[in-house]
């Protein structure tokens, strides 16, 4: 233990307590502190006073490694932001899950639809929807980081979001809209909703992390006498895992909306998300006094681009942008800003392979739905199995936290890059399973390689294979999300400077847009009898991408602590929150 500060009173003549008396004495310390009887503290053994003086001081590096880390209390404002995210994700998944049927089928088909764009047309438009939803976060982040701040940006984009859902709902009512009105209304609605969801999504996760007090880890002495480290890292990790849990609880809306779509009509499936989303602006308004609002940076994004440009022009050497080395240039930023931008660029390299992952992930909301439509549904909606993905995540997040990750760490470190690699592997295995399943669908009658596309009497008759067999594909995608998506979300936040949290988060999200763009290009292959080869190609691509990712970036695991140390620095008396990888401390929670 490091040397403690000298006591305020003379303790040289106070005898030491034996180890067996420590716990009782320390309990008395806490009791005396609570009652305010400070004069009796002098009567306690010196060893207990040393522990008392430890309370609140910064730990040494050795103590950081050896002592158990615990979380701070999660602020009320974090819970309020989580409710906003729950409402937004409930609406997003509740709306988008019926989209494939809405776009692909006609009102006379089983499952029924509206726009009758066929599989390849619906898949292309589905990928456009995903592309738009994940390219708009760039705009939302720019607005937040440059002009409005995160809270105000979320409020603005929530209003836009509501307008889009309202248009979708109205144009899906059969008595109100014709075919042309439904098609035009659908396109306008997804553009407006995509703008709204992009603006909310790029800002809500940084906002929830901003609610954590910006303090360094400190030693805390528990009533049991155990010395632990009260670590904001653990608090942020708890918040992010809870945040992702809220996302997937919200995604369970697919059970309700697909059932309404199946048993009533699409308008009923869209009315529920419209009503539920109204919770978001209400919570934002009522919780306004409680939110921590980080001030808007001064042209931070423009300056970061200029700083990066100078580095790229000099072969990625950020020394070219350092004011101390080039005082004559009059750069309007500090040394620390350059280091923050360098770290952000360093982290963004990790995102380069994510478009392949998101391309594979996107199969869950388009081709998987179409595949289920070729199978015997036994009264179930063909798009309801997406709930398996959410249920998998809800169940296995705590299992991974409490058991799987700690068990692996007993034998080897399990850091961010390794987790992302295994996320790619699970996604690849999901495509392998889907390809094998598609092969067996083609082996069954009555239409074999052209389900519902053969003789007229079999137009509405699926091939003889049970929909439940598709379940493992959704399970594998869910496991890949726990490893790749959550870790990527955390990596984007922790490696971003305080003034650029929203922007770097949006860069991570925009990789989904690139994956969707690839999906649009590949959508002509999404038709019978080519689907086995579609899934095979995706499986191989994801496997190769995962292997290349690990080969290129595995050394980032060794540098993670070095990168995270930047957040312990202080500038202009503003403390920045300390961050380490989620994988470092889950076992201590």
UniProtKB/Swiss-Prot annotation:
Glycans are attached at residue 233. It is a multi-pass membrane protein. It is found in: Cell membrane. It holds the Pfam family PTR2. The chain crosses the membrane at residues 74-95, 124-144, 153-173, 180-200, 236-256, 266-286, 345-365, 388-408, 420-440, 467-487, 502-522, 533-553. One of its GO terms (molecular function) is transmembrane transporter activity. Residues 1-56 are annotated as: Disordered. GO terms for biological process: oligopeptide transport; protein transport. Keywords: Cell membrane, Glycoprotein, Membrane, Peptide transport, Protein transport, Transmembrane, Transmembrane helix, Transport. Gene3D superfamilies: MFS general substrate transporter like domains. Peptide transporter that exploits the inwardly directed proton motive force to facilitate the cellular uptake of di/tripeptides. This is Peptide transporter PTR_A. The lineage of its organism: Eukaryota, Fungi, Dikarya, Ascomycota, Saccharomycotina.
